[in-house]
Amino acid sequence: MVATCLQVVGFVTSFVGWIGVIVTTSTNDWVVTCGYTIPTCRKLDELGSKGLWADCVMATGLYHCKPLVDILILPGYVQACRALMIAASVLGLPAILLLLTVLPCIRMGQEPGVAKYRRAQLAGVLLILLALCALVATIWFPVCAHRETTIVSFGYSLYAGWIGAVLCLVGGCVILCCAGDAQAFGENRFYYTAGSSSPTHAKSAHV
């Protein structure tokens, strides 16, 4: 029963974390920047935001973004962080699909528990790789951006990325280390048989 609960917890945690990583990858509010001194920017109400795909300016209620489409002039760290976040987002899809197939409520014929166990282990490894890619990108980007411009604060995209990466790391570790062995993945299968002298149904465990 404990192993079953941990499998579900690992799946839910990983799924929420993966969504956070996708949000981080697709949005541009990674860091809030200032082209002048911070007091001047606050007085002029002019702040910017920098992300993987665009540089944006917020001034007097207006929000304008300039897409970063010229790959040849982009800093190397931006291109590397793009690659890492895209890889993290892509790795999440097979990991979540594999976890779906090993949930206790999912049955794929009469497969042995060891097959589910191997898929769960593969999903756990993918989730940890996902988390590492996201963590490297979301730490590397603000460090390098700080060398180019003044950073006022971190944006919601970075926070979503950090939370998502940590959740995926926790989910992957739970699946790998705490969700049981091959027997635990095979013991939660049930079938129902009709009683010979009673209209009620008895539940029998099938290991």
From Swiss-Prot:
PANTHER family: CLAUDIN. Keywords: Cell junction, Cell membrane, Leukodystrophy, Membrane, Phosphoprotein, Tight junction, Transmembrane, Transmembrane helix. This is Claudin-11. It is found in: Cell junction, Tight junction; Cell membrane. It comes from Homo sapiens (Human). Residues 1, 104-122, 179-207 are cytoplasmic. One of its GO terms (cellular component) is cell junction. It holds the Pfam family PMP22_Claudin. The gene is CLDN11.
